[in-house]
Swiss-Prot record:
Glycans are attached at residues 136, 157, 250, 289, 295, 354, 414, 418, 460, 484. The keyword Acetylation does not apply. Residues 18-500 are extracellular. Gene3D superfamilies: Acid Proteases. It is found in: Endoplasmic reticulum membrane; Secreted, Cell wall. This is Aspartic proteinase yapsin-1. Disulfide bonds: none annotated. It comes from Schizosaccharomyces pombe (strain 972 / ATCC 24843) (Fission yeast). GO terms for biological process: proteolysis. Pfam families: Asp. GO terms for cellular component: external side of plasma membrane; extracellular region; fungal-type cell wall; perinuclear endoplasmic reticulum membrane. Its EC number is 3.4.23.-. The keyword GTP-binding does not apply. The gene is yps1. Keywords: Aspartyl protease, Cell wall, Endoplasmic reticulum, Glycoprotein, Hydrolase, Membrane, Protease, Secreted, Signal, Transmembrane, Transmembrane helix.
């Protein structure tokens, strides 16, 4: 009999405003506001102030699922919510009349149920104050013709298809990037167990994504990234940014600068081990508490991902570390009795040149059932380590795309700021590390411990349940469904008093016509 675990998440809204501080620095600050719990709580995976030259954008921590910020787009500008994504280079917004589709006809195999069209529109677009992209009467809106479409499939199986457009991106209330290129997503495939995105702000380095033509033929192209476009317009000097999140859900995304007040101890710049992913070498994972210390030597790649909630460790390592912590296992979740958590207990991640990030076990608690605390450490069948949001709450990270370097430091929860703009290839305050793995074979696990480990015990938690969203919709394998152009036009005119105009209807009709011609709708 399957035992379900109920995980209680708080829903946190972060209010943001993009501020330009001059000469290439932009900044986004977080202000945390707590909202009632969502009816549906979703799990990402089952294993799974200011010198000149700085720019900033605000971010939101959504239910321990992902960070969001707002982009002000169009003339007049409208604010749209987007998830921060370190793994994808392209930025896109969901269209207000988004439709669900099944990409199986493209040879993409999916199983299980998915979010329906009605569910996507209700969840993503129902709030007028935080709606989806309307294709409204923006005087700066125009289509991109080569290529005209984009198609993205994420590693969690979320799949989106849409058109490439340009519009004005505003910041500091009066300045703008006039021809900001991004995508408008018209079709989405979202598994029922996943949380759909209202949009994505891609912060990965430039890499190819797909386009799909009228005959469903998929090709590739390299879209201009968000950071590349800011550099091209001399808003930033270099494609570089940093991220900080404290233990209360507040934080900032800082473009073109390092905030030296947000870390303590060493700030070490590590060479990326992957060209198209933010990954570095990790040398060991250590566990310590008030009575003992254990070290696990394992040289492998560690990926920084904001679209992941948990910290994923190779299975053997995950079980060994959690065993040392005294955790037990139930339905794939590691757990501890809440009243027995050692406040001195922590995981320490060691990177190159002995740089370390300490993550207290108490900050790994993702939910509680009675006296049982569930932990955000997940075993994975992969040999790599994935560092999700629970890691970012303890680390200040900086990414220099030109140098292919990632600098890390232990997060220091400080309300002040001390910004240093990036004016060359140098990372202010950082020690450059040139260490490369030599002593231990890749992914080999070697334990040194001050005590004898015991086996993990599996227990049954009879009073607990998993609250999992399940859609009743399972779309058949077919081509992306067509829009009803006539109905869209009627809706646009009927809603003219709510941000629509005759031009809105015309723009939407043009978008639909373009997609019909391309075979996308």
């Amino acid at each position: 009999m399957r035992i379900w675990i109920l995980i209680f998440f708080s829903f946190i809204k972060l209010v943001s405003s993009l501020q330009y501080t001059g000469n290439g620095v932009l900044a986004l600050d977080f202000v945390a506001k707590t909202f009632p719990n969502q009816e549906n709580q979703l799990e990402k995976r089952d294993y799974t102030y200011s010198p000149s030259g700085i720019t900033s954008f605000p971010l939101d921590l959504q239910s321990y699922t992902y960070y969001t910020t707002t982009l002000s787009i169009g003339r007049p500008s409208i604010s749209y919510t987007v998830a921060i994504d370190l793994d994808m280079p392209y930025t896109w917004l969901t269209y207000y009349n988004v439709m669900a589709f099944n990409p199986a006809y493209l040879g993409i195999v999916n199983s299980g149920t998915q979010w329906s069209t009605d569910e996507l529109r209700y969840f993503l677009c129902k709030k007028e104050s935080d709606s989806c992209y309307f294709g409204n009467a923006s005087s700066s809106f125009h289509f991109v013709t080569s290529p005209s479409t984009f198609f993205i499939r994420y590693d969690d199986n979320i799949t989106v298809a849409g058109i490439n457009v340009q519009d004005s991106l505003s910041y500091s209330h009066y300045q703008a990037l006039p021809d900001f290129q991004f995508g408008i997503t018209l079709k989405e495939y979202v598994p029922s167990s996943m949380l759909p995105y209202k949009g994505v702000l891609g912060l990965a380095a430039s890499t190819e994504i797909n386009s799909i033509d009228y005959s469903d033929s998929i090709s590739s192209f390299s879209p201009p990234t968000f950071l590349e476009q800011l550099v091209k317009e001399d808003i930033l000097a270099y494609p570089a940014f940093s991220m900080y999140l404290d233990n209360q859900g507040n934080g900032s995304l800082l473009l073109g600068a390092v905030d030296t007040s947000k870390y303590q101890g060493q700030f070490v710049a590590l060479k990326q081990t992957k060209l198209t992913h933010y990954a570095v070498s990790i040398y060991s994972v250590q566990f310590l508490n008030s009575t003992f210390f254990s070290n696990y030597s394992i040289i492998t790649d560690a990926y920084f991902q904001t679209r992941e909630t948990y910290i994923y460790l190779p299975a053997e390592l995950a079980y060994s570390v959690m065993d040392n912590a005294g955790a037990y296992l139930s339905e794939g979740y590691f757990a501890l009795n809440c009243d027995e958590i050692d406040l001195e207990a922590a995981l320490i991640f060691q990177f190159g040149c002995n740089s370390t990030i300490k993550v207290p076990i108490s900050l790994l608690v993702i939910g509680q059932v009675s006296n049982i605390c569930l932990l955000g450490i997940r075993p994975s069948t992969d040999s790599e380590i994935v560092l999700g949001l629970l890691f970012f709450r303890n680390a200040y990270t900086f990414y220099h795309q030109s140098q292919k370097m990632i600098a890390i430091g232990q997060a220091f929860y400080n309300a002040t700021s001390n910004l240093s703009a990036i004016v060359d290839q140098h990372i202010p305050g950082a020690l450059t590390c040139s260490q490369y793995p030599t002593s231990v074979a890749s992914t080999q696990l070697v334990q040194t411990s001050h005590f004898t480990s015991t086996s993990l015990s599996a227990v049954n938690i009879s009073e607990s349940v998993v609250y999992s969203y399940t859609s009743s919709s399972s779309m058949p394998s077919s081509a992306i469904p067509s829009f009803n152009i006539s109905l869209i036009s009627q809706n646009a005119v009927a809603n003219a008093g709510n941000s629509f105009s005759p031009l809105s209807a015309m723009v939407i009709m043009m978008m639909s016509a373009v997609f019909l011609g391309l075979g996308i709708i």
